[in-house]
Amino acid sequence: MYVSLQKRQAVCTAFALSIGLFTIPVHAQTASFKDLPADHPVFAAAEYLKSKGIISGYSDGTFKPDKGVNRAEAIKIIVAPIIDAASIAQVTSSPFTDVKQGDWFLGYVEAARQNGIIDGPPKKTAFNGGNPVLKAEFIKMLQQANNAKPLETLSEIQLPIAPDVAKLDDWFYPYMRYAIASSMTMIGADGLLHPDRPLTRGDCALILHRYLMYKDGRRTQALLSEAESEIIIILGALEKNDIMTAEFASARGLLAARGAHLSKPDEPIVQGALKTAEAFRALVRAYRAGLNKQYDEVTKLAGDAWNLASRAKELAPNLAAISDQVQTISKGMADSARTLMQTPQ
């Protein structure tokens, strides 16, 4: 309705060139695990976590990235790096009905309960350590363990972010929201976030590694790349009049840009990228208003997008190309809305 394929290609190319400034060099590493060659998606995560003593492999020299992880194993992965081993060894009992003296995971579970990483009685009477750990559970526990405050951080953003993370009152919503902003996860090829998916060792390694890198200020490039990917999705969806997909993507793109800004608030390219993400969010809202025949709102939101794009190139002049394209799209939306307002219904 408002966006052409030619404009979409120009926007994405400009953004890709701009965020390339944040490319982080990759150094060659020797593989520690027989089943994780250097080109495996989990390679870098496993090597880093092994170097920090957080995750180890098996006696046969493998990592087994596809092996499922239960809740007890997940708690150990999360708790072991932050609670000293002596304290864990001193634990002799737990109020959980299914955690007994002699269980290898007793100390880790009790340390997690005492530190607010997991809920205990009376809210939860059983730990269910043998159950597979689900993605949202692992993400929540990891955030709690690191005092991330996901219920407060970015709480002003109350937007559906995927078809399976669309209800703002779902218990896992704030944790998945912060997971996107901290580069812990992103959508898959199916456009979903899969909060209820059982995790493997490889999954846990990736999520943990990404979060530790984010805390260390080393995921800015990844977050800006994710914001770029969401812009591609937005414009492709709008070409197909798929407004829901565009809305999900605009929310995720905004979260990714906000996450980068939380990490590197003084970087001009990050400041400009945030304004760009905000501009695309305004464009999507304008498109929705157009579908609802709220043409006054279209012109207002298109104007907002125009102004945000102007601010983006002021902050980061190398974003001029994408900012100009946003303004071209904004003008087209506003002009179309004005024409429709003057057309007899």
Could you say what each language-model-derived stretch is?
Residues 8-14:
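Sec-dependent signal peptide recognition
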Residues 46-49, 74, 78, 112, ...:
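A short amphipathic alpha-helical interaction element
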